[in-house]
């Protein structure tokens, strides 16, 4: 494990934005503070470094986001959309919505960045506007194993169930 200094972390960035099926994140962005994060977050990005892979046509995909291509990560990103994951259940009431203050209370003394998502306080899918955040947690050590990475994110989700359960594997 490689020690991390302060609240620094590394994101891996694509040269596209909002492309749902993008899997290539070849550009490294060292985050030392809010300004660096704001610059990197303008583009599709991930918290883990991934190796190159081949697509079905045999073409190389640089820094391919995939579990088998996981190399390392020094931060964990979690989402909180304040929505009910079970479509059969009623929507969450506003008094159940979580904010950065709730995350800070759940993780006392743990540094994190809270970034409003692009749908923060916007109506979406027929649901009323609500707070939606991406949370970035700089790690004290670099994780270099996909199973350990997924276990860390799963543990964070178990500790704070309001985090989105769809983004806890090593390919997220």
Q: What do these predicted ranges mean?
A:
Residues 152-156:
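Amphipathic alpha-helical coiled-coil/leucine-zipper-like oligomerization segments
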């Amino acid at each position: 494990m490689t020690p991390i200094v302060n609240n620094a972390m590394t994101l891996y960035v694509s040269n596209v934005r909002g492309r749902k099926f993008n899997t290539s994140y070849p550009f490294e962005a060292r985050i030392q503070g809010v300004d660096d994060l704001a610059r990197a977050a303008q583009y599709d990005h991930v918290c883990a470094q991934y190796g190159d892979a081949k697509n079905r046509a045999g073409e190389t995909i640089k820094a391919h986001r995939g579990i088998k291509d996981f190399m390392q990560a020094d931060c964990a990103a979690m989402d909180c959309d304040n929505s009910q994951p079970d479509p059969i259940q009623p929507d969450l009431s506003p008094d159940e919505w979580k904010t950065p203050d709730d995350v800070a209370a759940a993780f006392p003394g743990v540094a994190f960045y809270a970034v409003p998502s692009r749908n923060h306080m916007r109506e979406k899918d027929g649901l009323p506007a609500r707070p939606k955040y991406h949370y970035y947690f700089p790690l004290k050590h670099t994780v270099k194993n996909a199973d350990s990475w997924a276990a860390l994110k799963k543990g964070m989700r178990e500790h704070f169930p309001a985090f989105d359960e769809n983004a806890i594997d090593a390919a997220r």
